[in-house]
Amino acid sequence: MTQLTHINTAGEAHMVDVSAKNETVREARAEAFVDMQAATLAMIIDGSHHKGDVFATARIAGIQAAKKTWELIPLCHPLLLTKVEVKLEAQPEHNRVRIETCCRLTGKTGVEMEALTAASVAALTIYDMCKAVQKDMVIGPVRLLTKSGGKSGDFKVDI
């Protein structure tokens, strides 16, 4: 089994030293879902929600969250992201919104946490904007879809 990288030999949490790593292009994709009633989703789709464009707000929130991941997750490195993309898709057949994020950089550490944070915060923003009309929305699952670059190799979730 692989060792936990954020725990040192004394069992203490620490930030991983990446100074000796090579810079490579690294990319990660993540997804999240927000399940809701058909009427709530219809308000988002037709733009009749009183708070405005839910998707535009969630997209910007996800992008901002990716850029601030290092401030939210204690042992994450501050990263110079070169791409953050947040796609939102209404799925009326499932009464939900699907969020897919992509983060990329050329650097010494991966961007999985940035992609996951972007997806999570976009989902939370949808909840926040729609909670006045529906409080029992469900967020999840949130998961990593792919990662590439770095010495640990590539990852792709089995769908």
From Swiss-Prot:
CDD domains associated with the record: MoaC_PE (cd01420)
UniProt cross-references to InterPro entries, sorted A to Z: MoaC, MoaC_bact/euk, MoaC_sf, MoCo_biosynth_MoaA/MoaC, Mopterin_CF_biosynth-C_dom
Residues reported to bind substrate: L75, C76, H77, M113, E114
Keyword terms of this UniProt record: Lyase, Molybdenum cofactor biosynthesis
Residue numbers annotated as active site: D128
Gene3D superfamilies linked to this entry: Molybdopterin cofactor biosynthesis C (MoaC) domain (3.30.70.640)
GO molecular function annotations of the record: cyclic pyranopterin monophosphate synthase activity
GO biological process, one term: Mo-molybdopterin cofactor biosynthetic process
Alphabetized HAMAP family for the sequence: MoaC_B
Family recorded in the similarity comment: Belongs to the MoaC family.
NCBIfam families: moaC, PRK09364.1
Biological function: Catalyzes the conversion of (8S)-3',8-cyclo-7,8-dihydroguanosine 5'-triphosphate to cyclic pyranopterin monophosphate (cPMP).
Name the record gives this protein: Cyclic pyranopterin monophosphate synthase
Organism per entry: Yersinia pseudotuberculosis serotype IB (strain PB1/+)
